[in-house]
Amino acid sequence: MDSLALAPQVYSRKDKSLGVLVANFLTLYNRPDVDLFGLDDAAAKLGVERRRIYDVVNILESIGLVARSGKNQYSWKGFGAVPRALSELKEEGMKEKFAIVPFVAKSEMVVYEKEGEESFMLSPDDQEFSPSPRPDNRKERTLWLLAQNFVKLFLCSDDDLVTFDSATKALLNESQDMNMRKKVRRLYDIANVFSSMKLIEKTHVPETKKPAYRWLGSKTIFENRFIDGSASLCDRNVPKKRAFGTELTNVNAKRNKSGCSKEDSKRNGNQNTSIVIKQEQCDDVKPDVKNFASGSSTPAGTSESNDMGNNIRPRGRLGVIEALSTLYQPSYCNPELLGLFAHYNETFRSYQEEFGREK
C-alpha cells in the first residue's frame, strides 16, 4: 500500500496524447528561472515514460523552443527563439521548394525515405529541379526532421491550408513500407503538438471535407497562454480580490478582456468606473458656486445670494476637487450596503431613545 501511495500519478489513456503532454510540459518549464532540464526529471514530474518526453523535446527542438546541451539534458530557449527558427526553416525550405511545395496541392508524392542511394521519385520533367539526395537517410526518419519538414510545408506554401493526405504523401513513403502506419501516427503526433501550441489549427477542406491544417504562425503563440514567463509577470501581481470598501468593479480585469473596447467603456458610463481627470483638464476647469451650491449639497445657513455677494469661490486645487466632486457625483449605489447602513442608523436611534428614557 505504501509503495502504491508513493508511486507517481500516471496519465489516463486520454492524457497520453502528445498534445496534452506538451501543454503540461510547457506549464512546467515555461518559466524565466528555467535554463536547463533533464528528460528523467521531466518524466518523473509529469508521470510518463521518458520516451514520451523525448518525443516532445524533439518536436519542440524542431522549432527552436529547446536545444540539446548534453546527454538527456536540454536547454530552454523560450518562445522568443521561435520566430528566428521559423525564418531559418523557411529559408531552407525555399531552396527545396520545387521538391516539396508545388506538388502538395496536386497530391503527388515527392519526398521518399528509402534505404540505399535512390533519388527522390519525381517525374522526368521535374527531376531537373530536384535537390541532390541526402546521404544520411536514417536521419530523414527522425521525429525532429519530420517535424521540420512538416513546418516547411506551411512556410513555403502560398496557401496556409495543407491537407493531411498531401502532407503524408509529400513527407512519407507509402509504397511497400511496412512501417507506414507508424510513420503516419508520428505525423499525427507532430500535428497534435503544434495544434495544442496554436501554431496550426485543425480544420477541413470545404469542398472535399478532408482533414487539413491551417497555419496560424508564431504570433498566435504569444496571443494565447503559451507565452514567455517573463512577459506574464506583469499579470502576476494584479490582485484577484478587491479590498473591503473599494469598488466592486475590477477595472484591471475589464481591461484585460479581449472583447472590451473603448466604445464599450463609454457606453457603460460612469456607473462602475472611477473618473480619471488629467492635470491639463483640471487647470482649465473654472468651478462656479452657482452650479453646485444648491439643493441638498448646499450647507445649512448659506444662500446663493450671500455667496455671490461675497464673491466666494474655491481657490487652488482643493477648490477644483471640491467642484468636481459635486459636479460628478458617482451614480453607483449598492442597495445591500444602504440597507445595512439604514439598519445601523435605526438601531443607533433606538439606543439613544432608550438612553434618554433612563435619564
From Swiss-Prot:
Residues 293-309 have a biased composition (Polar residues). Residues 13-78, 138-217 bind DNA. It comes from Arabidopsis thaliana. Keywords: Activator, Cell cycle, DNA-binding, Nucleus, Repressor, Transcription, Transcription regulation. Preferentially expressed in proliferating tissues. Highly expressed in young stalk and young flowers. Lower expression in young leaves and mature flowers. Detected in cotyledonary vascular tissues, the shoot apical meristem, the base of trichomes, the fully developed stomata, the central root cylinder and in the columella of lateral roots but not in the primary root tips or in the leaf epidermal cells. Belongs to the E2F/DP family. This is E2F transcription factor-like E2FD. The lineage of its organism: Eukaryota, Viridiplantae, Streptophyta, Embryophyta, Tracheophyta. The keyword Membrane does not apply. Gene3D superfamilies: Winged helix-like DNA-binding domain superfamily/Winged helix DNA-binding domain. Residues 255-274, 288-313 are annotated as: Disordered. PANTHER family: E2F TRANSCRIPTION FACTOR-LIKE E2FD, TRANSCRIPTION FACTOR E2F. The two DNA binding domains are required for binding to the E2 site. Its main location: nucleus.
